[in-house]
Amino acid sequence: MAKITAQLVKELRERTGAGVMDAKKALVEVDGDMDKAVQYLRDKGMAKAAKKADRVAAEGLTGVYVDGNVAAITEVNSETDFVSSNDKFVNLVNAATKTIAEGKPANMEAAEELKMADGTTLAQSFVDATATIGEKIVLRRFALEEKTDDQEFGAYQHNGGQIGVITVLEGADAATAKHLAMHIAAMSPKVISPEELDDDFITDQLAVMNHKIDQDNESRALVNKKPLPYLVYGSEKQLSDEILAKAKEDIKAELKEEGKPEKIWDKIIPGKMQRFIDDNTQVDKQFAVLSQNYIMDDSKTVGEFLKEKGAKLVAFQRYEVGEGIEKKQEDFAAEVREQMK
C-alpha cells in the first residue's frame, strides 16, 4: 500500500479544495493515485450535490466582468449569506463570470460546458464547490453585452456584490456610463423607455399604486385630511392626443372658474399640463430608466440628462441577488426537534 504523505494530501487539497480528512481518505481509497483521488472526490461531490439539489439557494453574489468590447454579468447563489464572504465562493464567482465573458455561450447549457482555467467544466466547478463549501452552489443566470469601439461600458456592483449592473452607452464617456450604472443599481428600472412597458404590466402596477392610495386615504381620514385622488393613467403610452387635449381644456375651465385673467393663461397652462403628465406617468417613473429623476441631479430625468450630453443608453443589465426566488422560512424550533429524534 502506498504511503500517504503530507505532501500528497497538500497537492490533492490544492487541486480540489477538499478538506484535510477528505483528501487523506480519498488517497487511502485509491492507494495514493492522485488522478483517481481527484475523480473519487468529484464523484463524492456529485453525490453531495445531488442530496442538496432540492435546497433553496437564494443568497450569494453577482459577478461583473468587462474585457474590451464584451461584458458579462452573473448571479451565483448559495444557501446562506455567510458563504458569500468565503474566498472560495468569491473566487468561483469571478472565475465563472470571466469564463462566460470569454466563451460567450448562447445559453445555460453551453455555459456549463465551458472550460475553466484549470480545465474543469463550469458545471463541474459548481459541483466541486457544493462539496467543498458544504452548501448548494448554483449559477442561476447570466447575461452578455457587446459594444462597438465608439460605445462605452459602465459597470458597478453595490453592497459587496448584492447588486450588479452593466450599461452600454453611445456618445458618452466612461464616467457617465458608470454613473448611470450606479443610478440603475439604486432605482431598479426594468426597461429603458416607457414604450417597452407591457400594457398589462402598466394596468397591474396602476392597481398596486391605487391600492396604496386606498391605504393612505384610510390613514388620512383618521386625521381629517383630504383624500388623495386615484391614478387614472400610469404611462405616457396611455396619454393620447385626445386625453392631453381634454386635460388642457379642463385646465382652462378651472382657470376661468377661478377668475384668472385669460391673458395670463399661457403662462399657467404649461406648468399645469406638466403636472398632469407627471401625475399620470408614475409607472414610467418607477420602471423606465429614461423617465426616472436622475439621482445625480434630480432636477432632470435621465432622458433629459443624456440628451444634454448627446448620449444614448443602448442597453443595460441589472441583477439583484435572490430577486424572484421564494426564500424558505426556517422553523428553527422544528429543526432542533428533528435533530433530537
Swiss-Prot record:
Region of interest (Involved in Mg(2+) ion dislocation from EF-Tu), residue spans: 80-83
Pfam family, one: EF_TS
Domain of life: Bacteria
PROSITE patterns, sorted: EF_TS_1 (PS01126), EF_TS_2 (PS01127)
A single GO molecular function term of this UniProt record: translation elongation factor activity
S-S pairs: none
Subcellular location: Cytoplasm
GO cellular component terms given for this protein: cytoplasm
Keyword terms of this UniProt record: Cytoplasm, Elongation factor, Protein biosynthesis
Major place of residence: cytoplasm
Tagged with keyword Protein biosynthesis: yes
Family the entry assigns: Belongs to the EF-Ts family.
Function comment: Associates with the EF-Tu.GDP complex and induces the exchange of GDP to GTP. It remains bound to the aminoacyl-tRNA.EF-Tu.GTP complex up to the GTP hydrolysis stage on the ribosome.
Protein's name in the database: Elongation factor Ts
